[in-house]
């Protein structure tokens, strides 16, 4: 519920959402593009979060165009950088989601969120659908990305040991 309120998907029953001291509009539809860019969601089920009819380069390119205004070669370069950031080969840009494993899809889901250059990533049970080895690898990737990008994470999980291994603070 907290993540959905932060993202503007649900209204808060009371209070307000502040980011860097500025109040965010409660409803997603009323947020400005700059507000939308600041908070990105990484959903639990990458299968349903990725459009099966679009190639990975299109999925990653859409937020690059929408939020950052990138086009052409600059957009292509950034798509390849994003794939590298989430430790996927560059040739994945030409693939469709159905050609990827669950862990690879979740990495694409993460890359799509990072494409917006957000301040906060809302990670809702991002490893619960993955086996333990793949999930552990994704957690290590998230730790590296946090150091590399400086993005803050709201990490939601029912597995407290996973949360403890990742979090600076647990609420």
Task: State what each model feature region is.
Residues 45, 54-66:
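Q-loop/switch helix immediately C-terminal to the Walker
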Residues 96-100, 104:
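Conserved ABC ATPase signature
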Residues 163-165:
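A short, surface-exposed alpha-helical micro-motif characterized by mixed small hydrophobic
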Residues 24-40, 58, 66:
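ABC ATPase NBD coupling module
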Residues 117:
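Conserved catalytic motifs of ABC-family nucleotide-binding domains
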Residues 73-91:
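Conserved ABC ATPase "signature" region
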Residues 7:
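Helix-to-loop junction immediately C-terminal to a conserved catalytic motif
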